[in-house]
Amino acid sequence: MKKSILAIAIFAITLISSTEISAQKFPKLDLSPLDAASYPSSYKISDKVVKVVYGRPQLKGRDLAKLAPNDKVWRTGANEAAEITFYKDVVFGGKVVKAGTYSLFTIPASEADWTVILSTARNVWGSYFYKQDEDVVRVSGKISTSEKSIEAFSMLFDKNMTLKMGWENTVVSVSITLAGSED
């Protein structure tokens, strides 16, 4: 009888401790969640040309120049550097780029076009370890002004496959076409 009670007690303690060990502690929602944009943008079209995955920081009353300093390489988003995947060879800002996945960095400028960089480095946290010798291309991102302030950093591809990056009142555009179709 004592052995049965002891066995049941050991079983109960084991069961209780095993449920505590296996209980998952999920993290809170990231304040700068990841987002993605693709072209074509319709989820019904599976034959994509390009997709970009990036973190979406928010202004929250802060100045864009403090979050993405002028004349310094920026991760183009929050947390990890943005990554862009081309499923086909493209012409990115006038320069041919082979199909593949690249980190997307930018160098903001206050009064001029931004520099947009595709790098072979991948799975990179921020721009802390950016190396210019890993650049595939550097192109000019044309600047325009948004009438409405854009609170969360955003990227999209318009109907012409132009990459648009917007934050605060700044919109940076880089043309993309399929390689061989630039005629």
PLM regions and their residue ranges:
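Bacterial Sec-dependent N-terminal signal peptides
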Residues: M1-F26
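Short capping micro-motif at the N-terminus of alpha-helices
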Residues: L6, V52, A99-G100, V174
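Residue-level signal for beta-strand positions within conserved beta-sheet cores that form or flank
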Residues: T19, A112, D135
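Short, charged N-terminal helix-start/capping segments
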Residues: T19-Y39, F86-V90, K95-G100
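A broad, low-specificity signal marking well-ordered, structured residues that form hydrophobic/aromatic
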Residues: I21, V50, A82-I84, V116, ...
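Primarily secretory-pathway and cell-envelope proteins
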Residues: Q24-R75, V124-D183
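Mid-length scaffold segments of soluble, non-membrane domains
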Residues: W74-V124
